[in-house]
């Protein structure tokens, strides 16, 4: 049997920084919803077994998506924070996962990934947990009250992306332990790091942007034209 990959997509957030009553994943990107573009790349990628989407309890939009009723898409109730949503989705995954299975956790609002990108991350699955990330290019400043306090060296600094890949049981244990100990985690890798797990970096594509603010849709649209 070929190795299987579960996909977890936390989509319970309100997207307050986007500045719209409609969560960012439900906005249109060139005539398709952002989340449909995100789902599509995974549903058409051969190693994908199932896609588990964590939704807000009051989400009434997902059922209107083109791919929300796909036979390989499973809905679970999300939590208040991203880590809570991922943990709830992983509880489902771990109930059915095989020992050799992996999981990739991916932002609903990163719709531009290509199958060949997933292949590169999948290629290191036997060795380690791994994430996509990009080297920091901008000069970094630490500020207080709108004033620069210091310039921070960007040596060895990377900006984390998704997907982030791990063994589903190991990731669930890491997230649960961090929750129990009150350790704040901002992505899956930080939970694994907190437990001393080794997480490798695979350089992600520059176009793997996260739609966070309204003008990101314009950037994503331009990038999509390039990719098509």
What residue ranges belong to the model's regions?
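N-terminal glycine-rich phosphate-binding loop and ensuing alpha1 helix
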Residues: 2-60
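Conserved beta-strand scaffold positions in the cores of enzyme catalytic domains, especially
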Residues: 26, 75, 129-130, 199-201, ...
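Acidic helix N-cap motif at the loop->helix transition within catalytic regions
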Residues: 60-66
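Short phosphate-binding loop-to-helix
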Residues: 67-101
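Acidic metal-phosphate-binding loop of nucleotide-sugar-dependent transferases
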Residues: 82, 108-112
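Short aromatic-hydrophobic micro-motifs that form the base-stacking/packing surface
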Residues: 102-106
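Conserved core of the sugar-phosphate nucleotidyltransferase
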Residues: 113-202
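Hydrophobic helical membrane-anchoring modules
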Residues: 208-228
């Amino acid at each position: 049997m070929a190795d299987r990959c579960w996909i977890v997509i936390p989509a319970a957030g309100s997207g307050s920084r986007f500045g719209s009553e409609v969560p960012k994943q439900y906005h249109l990107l060139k005539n398709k919803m952002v989340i449909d573009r995100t789902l599509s790349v995974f549903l058409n990628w051969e190693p994908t077994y199932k896609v588990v989407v964590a939704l807000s309890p009051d989400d009434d939009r997902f059922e209107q998506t083109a791919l929300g009723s796909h036979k390989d898409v499973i809905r679970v109730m999300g939590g208040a924070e991203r880590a809570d949503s991922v943990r709830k989705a992983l509880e489902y995954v771990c109930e059915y996962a095989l020992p050799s299975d992996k999981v990739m956790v991916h932002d609903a609002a990163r719709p531009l990934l290509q199958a060949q990108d997933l292949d590169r991350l999948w290629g290191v699955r036997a060795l380690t947990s791994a994430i996509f990330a990009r080297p920091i290019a901008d000069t970094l400043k630490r500020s207080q009250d709108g004033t620069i306090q210091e310039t921070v060296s960007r040596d060895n600094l990377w900006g984390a992306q998704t997907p982030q890949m791990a063994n589903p049981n190991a990731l669930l244990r890491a997230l649960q332990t961090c929750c129990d100990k009150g350790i704040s985690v901002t992505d899956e890798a930080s939970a694994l790091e907190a437990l001393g797990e080794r997480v490798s970096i695979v350089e992600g594509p520059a176009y793997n942007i996260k739609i966070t603010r309204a003008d990101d849709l314009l950037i994503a649209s331009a990038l999509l034209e390039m990719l098509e």
